Amino acid sequence: MAALDLSKGRDVEYAAGLALALSRDSSRSQPIADDLEKRFPEDTFAKFTYVPVLRALSALEDGKPTDGVERLQIALPYQLAVTGLNFNHFYLGGLHSAYVRGEALLAARRYAEAAAEFQKILDHRGIVGSDPIGALAHVQLGRAFVLSGDKIKAKTAYMDFLTLWKDADPDIPILTQARAEYAKL
């Protein structure tokens, strides 16, 4: 939120809104989505990526994964686009719609479709750059495979993540979760 005190730029607002939405705080992320929609009605990334991602995350928080998937339909033609905002190979927004669509599809128990969304992220590493969704897609892909009953592919996805994060601090929550989930396989 401190970033919003310094700037009301489109990308700063989206980054703050995304952090809030991923933290399941739609009471604060949705006013940001409203503001982006109001101030940037013709902006391609605001209209077709940023706002739909924030709205879909809110739908997920509300337990409405199908609504989340529907809200992201508008983003499909733009999901491989790059905003032009690059922080040392961190492209803000690139494939966020695919990641959130994958989460929504998992919640809707559409596991094969969810796996395809997470695989899309892994297949386009150049767009994702060092965005955390690049690593997290491995975990989510593993989860999709577990839920669809394919333990062999799940093990591979989890191992890919654990290899990427082999030097990470050992108490990071997603890492401990991934290790525990992998151990159950």
Predicted features, each with a name:
Residues 4, 43-44, 89, 129, ...:
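Structural signature of alpha-solenoid helical repeat scaffolds
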Residues 52, 59, 71, 98-105, ...:
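TPR/Sel1-like alpha-solenoid repeat signature
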Residues 15, 19, 49-50, 54, ...:
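"A position-specific structural signal for the A-helix of alpha-solenoid helical repeats
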Residues 21, 73-76, 119, 146, ...:
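TPR/TPR-like (Sel1-like) alpha-helical repeat modules
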Residues 1-5, 34-41, 73-85, 116-126, ...:
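Amphipathic alpha-helical segments of tetratricopeptide repeats
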